Amino acid sequence: MPRADPSEGGFRPLAELYGDGIAGHVEETGRRMGTGPGRVAASTAQLGLASRLWSLALGCAALGSEVPDLGPGRLWWRRPSAGPVELRLPAPRPLPGPLPEALHRAVAVGHLAPLAEAVGSRYAVSPQVLRGNAASALVGAVRVLLDQAPEAAGRAVPLVEHLLGRPPLAHTGTFVHEEGLGVAFVRRSCCLFYRVPAETCGDCVLRTRDRRRPRT
């Protein structure tokens, strides 16, 4: 049978978001959030895409013992009318090497680095914020994974701890996992989501700062 065209259904190469294509995605993110296409929308768009990438790679590693080759030229994306970015990987193949290193190469090197460059250079979002977003996305991915497949903790949690202990995610926050209670993460940088009315993210550093302030 002929192989399906990956562009069917409106999918496009993810690599386009690491160049001028990021502008349209940030603009649409800002429209949906009501913030406009500025730093808040850019940070949120980067965080959302990082979440999808980590979820795909970590799930495969923890449940299937392999990390797929997610090269930007092989992975396709589309933006539905509502909800997060959708990803499509035609003809998946595994990356060689140990799982921790393969995860790092597939996501941190292959995607998060060029994405951070595209967002940071165009929207003046600091590298510290973008690294914190990437770490929050990873923790969010393992949180959802363990909610659905708690038996994966033995493989998934050490992988997350390894990734959070090395650049670019090192020193981005405090990660805790307790069996039966799940995972928690407190950032050391702000994702800027607090600028959306009445909103903060689940890992918000500002909540911690507020608790430390003396009451008057």
Over which residues does each language-model region extend?
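Local cysteine-cluster metal-coordination motifs and their immediate loop/turn environment
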Residues: 187-209
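Conserved functional hotspots at enzyme active or ligand-binding sites that engage polyanionic ligands
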Residues: 184
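Actinobacteria-biased recognition of intrinsically disordered, low-complexity terminal regions
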Residues: 1-20, 210-216
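Hydrophobic, aromatic-lined core segments that form the binding pocket/scaffold
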Residues: 12-181
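A generic "cationic amphipathic patch" detector
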Residues: 62, 147, 204, 214-216
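Generic intrinsically disordered, low-complexity segments enriched for polar/acidic and small residues
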Residues: 8, 172, 190-191
